[in-house]
Amino acid sequence: YRFSDGSYLECQDYWRMSGITRDVFIYSKPKTNIYDFFVKAGLDNNYRKGIFELSVDVNYGKKLPSVLTLEVALSNDEGSKNHIEKLYTKEITKQDLIDNQKRDGVSTIHFKDIIERVDAWSAEKPNLYDMTIRLKDKKGNVVEVVGSKVGFRTTEVKDGQLKVNGKPILIKGVNRHDHDGNTGQCVSREMMEKDIKLMLQHNINTVRTSHYPNDVYWYELCDKYGLYVIDEANNESHAQG
């Protein structure tokens, strides 16, 4: 039972070890909850204004609630060049849930705002904002709170040149496996921190997750310290000896 059918599709040039190698956890949610969210934080054509777009999937199961409220807070450090503290509030009625139904029991609520001035994220200046999403019931009680770091950035290719926030960049990258010489595919957070700091000391600005999505914490570190990520899907086959 070491391998499944999927093992041969997700089969890279790699040490093939068995066992649970990343965090596994069980958690409970209220019947009405934040099922998922997706945030897109870009820049306008002049690379000054921030374009904040957020989609929140609200799961309410079989029974439509009468009224819900979503609150979204967005802010950065007070000492930032362009400090902001935004609070977006949206009251959600039964009809809103019906009109925005994604599938049975789940509806998507959208937020969008143009922010006059933002501190853009780049490898040289990895500016991040704190985003918090609160779901409240009809009495104003907090049902669930989730959050994420957000970086405003725009990536594009113009005239054959890769640009971030309108500025040309030179990729100085490495490939990285989720692998530790002592613990195999179980990589500690401390080792990830050591990896990323070593990369920065050698002026590396890009990492390729060869050949599969990495641990979630690794992406958080790349956001925090300023590394571009070439993220690969776990879809590659090789012969096994």
Model features per residue range: what roles?
Residues 1-221, 225-229:
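Secreted/periplasmic carbohydrate-active enzymes, especially glycoside hydrolases
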Residues 171-172, 236-241:
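Active-site-adjacent "subsite" loops/lids of carbohydrate-active enzymes
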